[in-house]
From Swiss-Prot:
Lineage, highest ranks first: Viruses, Varidnaviria, Bamfordvirae, Nucleocytoviricota, Megaviricetes
Protein name: Uncharacterized protein L308
Source organism, top-level taxon: Viruses
Species name: Acanthamoeba polyphaga mimivirus (APMV)
């Protein structure tokens, strides 16, 4: 095992993670793999989305409240070993955020090139990564396998290649099938778990649409709440915000601000971002047929941009606070 001990002198690991040179090296490695870095989740908002999921082969993974992150193991040309994670999405320059060491022991084969994706969060002072996607494992490309096979493969491999520490856990996400009985079982298991706020519908064959569903007190199949991603535009009037569809300049409505909490939340978004328009997730109030802003969408800007794309100047506000 290649441990994270700083006293181990047999090799160098996770050197200079705060330096821009190291960050750029890690980005170059990730870009060199040819992996699609810009995968996004679509919101289930109507029956046609459910029909698409039903007519294609999907599995469901619970999404924990935390930061969606890249999880990378590799060795560079100078024989420095890296076991790191960092936010997948953000609205800040590459140089302005931190890369974090993964404090687990793994076998040498993972450093042949392992790229995964998952949710980072803290629970009772323990750092956790829940992996729900693997693109490459020990140099082997994984996307030709089905989603179910990828997760099962990872579960088996972790038994022999990963040793966790008391303060850091590396886990593989559970998955469920999207038939009504399985969804009810999933809902019964997670409805009292406040750390799980959404479920993700992954296609069994990589490359099809990935869907996200926000958990509510209603039945997950029969009462899908109407959600949408919309642009929220600030106006000169207090609590008056215009709404626009993505890729459209035509205003569709004015947002409904039902209470002081929503009012303060919207004001804070615009104060922090200094933008006039923000991409937000909205919920339809079915009684008055109005959209209520719920949360700002963090993948408004993709963290890993190509070299010729512009980079946003906003600061890193990830949940990776040490």
């Amino acid at each position: 095992m290649y441990t994270t001990s700083k006293n181990n002198t047999n090799y160098s690991k996770n050197l200079y993670l705060s330096s821009n040179k190291t960050k750029q090296e890690i980005f170059r490695y990730l870009n060199s793999t040819g992996i699609n870095l810009h995968t996004k989740f679509e919101i289930i908002s109507n029956e046609s989305d459910l029909n698409y999921i039903r007519d294609n082969e999907y599995i469901i993974c619970p999404k924990y409240s935390g930061v969606r992150s890249w999880v990378i193991f590799f060795k560079n040309d100078n024989d420095v070993y890296y076991a790191v994670s960092f936010p997948k999405y953000g609205r800040f320059k590459k140089e302005e955020f931190s890369i974090f060491p993964i404090d687990v022991s793994v076998t040498k084969q993972l450093y042949y090139g392992t790229i995964m994706e998952g949710i980072y969060f803290k629970m009772d002072n323990k750092k956790c990564l829940i992996i729900d996607e693997v693109y490459q494992f020990a140099g082997e490309h994984m996307l030709l396998k089905t989603k179910r096979d990828r997760l099962e493969f990872l579960q088996e491999k972790f038994k022999t290649t990963v040793v966790m520490t008391p303060n850091y856990g590396l886990y593989v996400s559970a998955y469920f099938y999207p038939d009504k009985e399985n969804i009810k079982e999933l809902y019964n298991n997670i409805k009292n778990n406040m750390s799980i706020q959404e479920i993700i519908f992954y296609p069994n064959i990589y490359g099809k649409k990935v869907y996200s569903y926000m958990i509510t007190e209603t039945d997950l199949v029969d009462n899908i709440i109407k959600l949408a991603q919309l642009y929220l535009e600030k106006t000169a009037s207090p609590d008056v915000y215009n709404l626009y569809r993505i890729n459209s300049d035509k205003k569709i409505d004015i947002a409904y601000i039902p209470d002081i909490e929503t009012s303060r939340k919207c004001k804070q978004w615009f104060k922090d971002s200094k933008e006039k328009k923000l991409l937000v997730r909205c919920k339809m109030d079915m009684n008055i047929k109005k959209w209520i802003p719920q949360e700002i969408i963090e993948n408004n800007e993709i963290l890993l941009e190509s070299e010729n794309e512009s980079e946003n100047e906003s600061e890193n506000e990830s949940e990776y606070d040490e």
